[in-house]
Amino acid sequence: MIALYKYAIKNGADYIFQTDSDGQTNPEEFAAFWQLRDKYDAVLGHRSVRGDGKSRAFVEHVVCFLLRCIFGVKVPDANAPYRLMKASLVDKYIDRLPEDFNIPNIMFTTYFAYYQERITFREISFKPRQGGVNSINIPRIIKIGWKAVGDFRKLKREM
């Protein structure tokens, strides 16, 4: 994902919109995000109701708890796959992340909140998966999570 963000920046994009391709988000909600683009540098989705199961919601709560403990930021949804960001804001933080960093959106949300950028969270609908195969299972989530804690601590020291 980092390479795609860099591609957009390199090619002069003013805004970067990111969403997943598995049909869980609603394209009709984009207009509300677009209307907020002049007021905020990033409009980030917030999934208070999730159609992807309790285990995924639990993982998101753990992530938000870790971000609060490690970075001192309180966000309602760190990794929502529906976000409209000014390319200049992404460019400001992207080089802080390793090229192969697995969860860049979580760190972008963290940086934006930590440095008090002009951001807002907007409720989005989040349906059960409509297509594709769930590539994340509990053992993989634990492995990613364990690595993330180490990565978060390292990135915090660099702030």
What are the residue ranges of the model-derived segments?
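Catalytic donor-sugar/metal-binding loop of nucleotide-sugar-dependent glycosyltransferases
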Residues: 100, 109-127
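C-terminal, non-catalytic tails of nucleotide-sugar-dependent glycosyltransferases
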Residues: 147-159
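Short, hydrophobic alpha-helical packing/hinge segments within bilobed ligand-binding/sensory domains
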Residues: 81, 108-109
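Short His-centered aromatic/hydrophobic patch
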Residues: 105
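Acidic metal-phosphate-binding loop of nucleotide-sugar-dependent transferases
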Residues: 23-24
